[in-house]
Amino acid sequence: METEIRCFQHCSRDWNILCFTIPDVCPLCGHDTMTTEMRIPPYLIQSPLTDANTTQCCVVIKPTIGCFLTDYTNQSNLHIAVTNTAGVVYEFDERGVTVGGSDWTQCLQVNVLGILSETVYKKCDETLAIMAQNETWTKEKYNEFSHNCYDFVMQFLRNISNVVKTGCLESRSLFCEQVIVPVTSKAGKYISMYRTIATDRYLIQKVA
C-alpha cells in the first residue's frame, strides 16, 4: 500500500500543508508543531488507487509497465481488465485470458456499470466465465494494436449493454475519451502531490 497523504493547517488558514509524516517544525512559521496548536488537525487525503481484489464487477486500469505512483506519465500505455463479483481479475494480453492476476494491488477503479442488481452481478460472472473460454480471446488471437485488452473489456461491456451507456463503446478512442481519461486525469492530481511530497517531504498548497 502506498504511503498515505495527510493534510493540515498550522498557522495560516490560507495554506494547507500536505505530507506523509507531520514535520516537527512548521515549514511556514518555523514553530514546533508538537507544542503549538494547529488550525486544522491532520486528516487523510483519500487515494484514488485501490486493490482490484476489493472491487466487484468493475473495470480496472493500471500502467502496462510499473505503477501509477512512481512510473505513470500521460504517455504511458495502460492495461485494462474487469473484475467479477469476488474481485477476481479477468485480463487479456499476449498470454490470452488470465484469471486471478495478483499484480492489481494499485489500480484505478472505473465504475462503468453504476449501481448493480443481483441479476446483473450474476450476468457479469457468467459473461466473464464464457469469455475466458471463448476462442476469440486466445493468445494466438491477441494483437497489440488491433485485438487487445481494450477490445476484451469493451466486448464484455457490450455483452451486458443493458446496464452500460453503449455510446462509449462505439470505438476504442471514444471509450478512452469518455471513460478512461476522466479517471486518469483526476488521479493525476493525487499522483503529482504524492511525487512532490516524496521528493520535498511536504507540499504547501494555497487554499482555493
Residue ranges and their predicted role:
Residues 1-9, 20, 37, 49-58:
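Plant-biased recognition of short, low-complexity, intrinsically disordered N-terminal tails
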Residues 38, 44, 52-115:
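Glycine-rich catalytic cores of cysteine/serine-nucleophile enzymes that process amide/ester linkages
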Residues 80, 88, 127-130, 155-159:
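Alpha-helical recognition domains of nuclear gene-regulatory proteins
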Residues 2-13, 19-32, 132-208:
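Activation targets extended, charge/polar-rich intrinsically disordered C-terminal tails
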Residues 104-106, 129-136:
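Surface-exposed beta-strand-to-loop junctions
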Residues 117-131:
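A structural motif
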Residues 30-40:
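Short Cys/His-rich micro-motifs in 6-15 aa windows
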Residues 13-14, 80:
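Alpha-helical and coiled-coil interaction segments, frequently adjacent to or embedded
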